[in-house]
Design a protein with these regions (language model features):
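Dual-mode signal for accessory low-complexity, basic/Gly-rich regions
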Residues: 391-417
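Active-site bordering "gate/hinge" segments
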Residues: 1-358
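Active-site and channel-lining beta-strand-loop segments
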Residues: 376-393
Length: 417
């Protein structure tokens, strides 16, 4: 092909647009099947059938395997089965208790979606057995790799390490190549049809049980002019897809019937004391939730006497918020707050509420935070009537880049949130 003329850029773009439109239904169908059908058990078979003492099993997934995945697997292999089972018990019991505390009937569910990073297979194997004892079969799928199904650079599902975070970030808006009003309708119609085809399986799906990780080196992306970016019109179209697809999911996997749990562990990249840190995290994850439930109830009973809560930062933190609480007619019988212990969010705990929007406002300042694998420095969100009206951070040299970074990765192009 040395003498062949290269196709024009527009020709290649048109071919890719046609491909995406032609195969949208097939891609959505496959993705939704993976999300609810336990018979699609590629990952389950690796977990349950492999010799986990031989780390070659990690390469059976087809994912990038780094020192983190190998290090976690080696460390878990050094633990006793009793220790592994204890970790799995904390994780699975958090899921079960989440249903109880949410007054939801777990016996109506038949599947649970397990999400994890490679290396945690010993724990996941034990968890699968415990979930099965509850009557739940595992549904485990790979993070989305096709642009039709991806959500920015988020990795939802089982995953290895990210070989090149900048590459993932650069390609987070590749849908800008083909996103238009016709595709919006095509994708939503494909999603609706796929869920209708799998509605029986979707109805008995219980929701996700997530094993997250922390300790990786900070990644601060660069803005590349060559990367695809959504136009203003496409941003609105993406918001429409996100909103409508969420409603479709909720019709078939009802929000008032499903639950979740999240637990997190360090990875070797955190430093030389990884084993010690991991052991301490295990202890934290198994704190006596009944004790903290009582402690947090004292906080709730105090806050329930208030109409307003003022939150101020210190030590250079500029947070200055005032939060308007709902009035309670009978303080002894009513409360504004949820006493959340080690169920859906492990470890304990948190006390949270949904405030009155009118009168709730101010500045939330976080010096450093990680969201979906991205670092935000000096993140500031300004609220008025409970909505974000202004925002900035210090990741980039220009204010335009900083605002765009927040719009893309926190606000997701909503005008207000």
């Amino acid at each position: 092909f040395e003498d062949s003329e290269l196709p024009a850029v527009k020709t290649v773009e048109d071919i890719l647009r046609s491909y995406v439109n032609d195969y949208c239904q097939d891609l959505m169908e496959q993705r939704i099947a993976e999300a609810v059908d336990p018979q699609l058990d590629f990952a389950v078979r690796i977990i349950m059938d492999s010799d986990l003492s031989d780390l070659k099993y990690l390469y059976a997934y087809g994912e990038y395997v780094s020192a983190n995945e190998r290090g976690v697997a080696e460390f878990l292999n050094s633990l006793s089965q009793e220790q592994i089972d204890s970790m799995a018990e904390t994780y699975t019991e958090g899921y079960r208790i989440g249903f109880i505390n949410g007054r939801k009937d777990i016996t109506r569910k038949k599947t649970v979606n397990i999400r994890y990073n490679l290396g945690f297979e010993r724990m996941v194997r034990s968890a699968i057995l415990k979930f099965r004892a509850m009557g739940l079969e595992p549904v485990i799928y790979r993070h989305a790799t096709h642009v039709v199904n991806k959500r920015g650079n988020a990795r939802i599902g089982f995953t290895g390490s990210v070989a090149n975070p900048q590459y993932d970030y650069d390609h987070r808006q590749d849908q800008a190549l083909f996103l238009d009003s016709d595709f919006v309708q095509r994708k939503l119609r494909s999603m609706q049809n796929a869920y209708e085809n799998y509605k029986e399986l979707a109805a008995v799906h219980g929701g996700p049980a997530c094993i997250e990780t922390f300790g990786e080196k900070p990644f601060v992306p660069e803005t590349k002019a060559e990367a695809w970016t959504l136009s203003e019109t496409q941003q609105k179209q993406q918001v429409e897809i996100d909103n409508e697809s969420g409603q479709i999911v909720n019709r078939y996997i009802k929000g008032d019937e499903r639950s979740f749990t999240i637990i997190a562990y360090p990875i070797p990249e955190i430093g030389e004391k990884f084993p010690e840190i991991f052991a301490e995290i295990v202890k934290i994850n198994t704190l006596d939730y009944k004790l903290y439930e009582r402690i947090q109830q004292t906080i709730i009973e105090t806050l329930d006497t208030c109409q307003w809560v003022e939150v101020k930062g210190r030590g250079g933190n500029e947070t200055d918020l005032i939060i308007h609480l709902h009035g309670l007619e009978e303080v002894k019988k009513q409360t504004n707050f949820e006493n959340c212990v080690a169920d859906v969010n492990i470890p304990v705990g948190e006390v949270f509420t949904s405030p009155v929007l009118a009168g709730t406002g101010g500045i939330l300042h976080v010096k450093k935070v990680y969201l979906n694998g991205l670092q935000f420095r000096d993140l500031k969100l300004v609220f008025d009537c409970g909505q974000v009206i202004d925002y900035t951070c210090s990741n980039f040299e220009t204010e335009e880049e900083n605002r765009a970074y927040i719009e893309d990765n926190i606000l997701f192009h909503h005008a207000k949130i």
